[in-house]
From Swiss-Prot:
GO terms for molecular function: translation elongation factor activity. Pfam families: EF_TS. This is Elongation factor Ts. It is found in: Cytoplasm. Gene3D superfamilies: 1.10.286.20, DNA helicase RuvA subunit, C-terminal domain (1.10.8.10), Elongation factor Ts, dimerisation domain (3.30.479.20). The keyword Protein biosynthesis applies. Keywords: Cytoplasm, Elongation factor, Protein biosynthesis. Its main location: cytoplasm. GO terms for cellular component: cytoplasm.
Length: 292
């Protein structure tokens, strides 16, 4: 039996909005597996708002650049929001993006070992900034996209999107990049949703219907309609267009004679846990480090 810690209970509460004792019980029954606990709580109706992506805690910036038919997007992490807003930190990230774009470097290790333009590698230059500011930093991920109709969109330096279209125009590609940033679709089209994702959601929805008092055969019929809505909700082309919710993205694309080949969405700190720190102490620590 896994040890159920206060931190695990706290995370489950934040991700489900359920009570402390319910979370502790769910974790115990799931042997400490948070994702399984969320799934079980959804089935029983306890989870009010299970957040699919989990908590986003790490700090940093997303940078995107494009030229012609090539676009690049990267994530540069740091420990605090204080440093994420630092001009030298941002300048380094922008220069790295320009280097990657110029040479179409999609391999992170190759990029880290590429000359920064100062006689030292990207990683050594980053290490020098770490020593200067006194906070750990990491060039976490990078992606290169190529196509005839590409667009990039950055929202508040924390969310970045590249869209790749066939047909349409630059404005449409940019609008859809903005849509992806705002609505976080997981797939391009409903038919792209994996069988595993569909099966898991179907099981959850059937259990919810049965627990509400419906016979199993009726519950299964009810779920068919819910599943169509589910696959549409998590797919770009099935969502209402962010700039005009009366239009579904699939219909917008048809009107414009365009198709979405792919999209890539980065959000700062996805999947990274960050130790909680007192903000005032965090600021004082950064000021002291800079003075030192």
């Amino acid at each position: 039996m896994a040890d159920i810690t206060a931190a695990m209970v706290k995370e489950l509460r934040e991700r489900t909005a359920a009570g402390m004792m319910d979370c502790k019980k769910a974790l115990t029954e799931a042997n400490g597996d948070i994702e399984l606990a969320i799934e079980n709580m959804r089935k029983s109706g306890q989870a009010k708002a299970a957040k699919k992506a989990g908590r986003i805690a790490a700090e940093g910036i997303i940078i995107a650049r494009s030229a012609g038919n090539v676009a690049v997007m990267l994530e540069l992490n740091c420990e605090t929001d204080f440093v994420a807003k630092d001009a030298s930190f941002r300048a380094l990230g922008e220069k790295v993006a320009e280097i990657a774009l110029a040479d179409k470097i999609a391999d992170l290790e190759v990029l880290k070992n590429t000359d920064f333009g100062n006689g030292e590698s990207v990683q050594v230059t980053l290490n020098n900034l770490i020593a200067k500011i006194g906070e750990n930093m990491n060039l976490r991920r990078i992606v290169i996209a190529e196509g005839d109709n590409l667009a990039t969109y950055i929202h508040g330096s924390r969310i970045g999107v590249i869209t790749k279209l066939v047909g349409g125009d630059a404005d449409l590609a940019k609008d859809l990049a903005m849509h992806v940033a705002a609505n976080s679709p997981q797939f391009v089209k409903p038919e792209d949703v994996s069988a595993e994702v569909v099966a898991k959601e179907r099981e959850i929805q059937v259990d919810i219907a049965i627990n509400s008092g419906k016979p199993k055969e009726i519950a299964e019929k009810m779920v068919e309609g819910r599943m169509k809505k589910f696959t549409g909700d998590i797919s770009l082309t099935g969502q209402p267009f962010v700039k005009d919710p009366s239009v579904i993205v699939a219909d917008l694309l048809k009107q414009k004679g365009a198709d979405v080949q792919d999209f890539i969405r980065f959000e700062v700190g996805e999947g990274i846990e960050k130790q909680e720190t007192d903000f005032a102490a965090e600021v004082q620590a950064q000021i002291a480090a800079m003075k030192g």
